[in-house]
Amino acid sequence: MAGHSKWANIKRQKARVDAKKGKTFTQLSRAIIVAARNGIADPNGNFQLRTAIDKAKAAGIPNENIERAIAKGAGTYQDDESILEEIRYEGYGAGGVAVSIEALTDNRNRTAADLRAAFSKNGGNLGQTGCVSWMFEQKGVVILEGEIKEDKLLEASVEGGAETYEIISEAEYQGAEVLTEVANLENLNQTLQERGLPVKEVELRWIPNNTIEISDPDQGRSLLKLLDTLESLDDVQNVTANFEIAENLTTLISAS
């Protein structure tokens, strides 16, 4: 069951970007609004909402802000954020790398303009709907953080209906990612927690079916800068790209 390295390569390549920034309060609050709107406003009966709240609390968002976001999603508190749309944008980075972007916006024209500018400044271009979506498949991901015993992870993953997992053991990070079908994410998360594994968070993620290895340092820098720029936009919730950086370039790019 152990996963092919492609499952975690995107996570590793983004470590440098993610270390510099976390999700903003705006991004996390919007995730709560949409989750409450798409289901019931009770986190006990809405897994998407419960997950969004957990992430917000981990980021230090005050409870009153969380409650306000839930109310907006439920329709009992009205403002501009109450009319948020979920939109998936697609484009190409340097060298034709496919980029998938999930956004929550109250003004799709503003969001498209911001994304177009981000792509053009970093050697890419915003594409038409459907141009790269076929290159990705949505999966449920349970992220573990800490030292992982593989035999314990394997047993729990099989029991929880996981498709694959990847253990990440590096000097700066110890953990694992466990993938499953979207409909099975809540069950897998519960199983891993019940088996005592260190679950940090869960999420839905678009996983590339295949990846392109980047061996040119300038292209690698351009792509990482593009991801950084896209993820810094408040309207953007998640960004996925179908590339991995050649191992011999990782240190060089990270040091630049």
What do these predicted regions represent?
Residues 1-127, 132-141, 185:
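N-terminal cationic and glycine-rich segments that engage phosphates or anionic surfaces
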Residues 143-256:
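Positively charged, low-complexity, intrinsically disordered RNA-binding extensions
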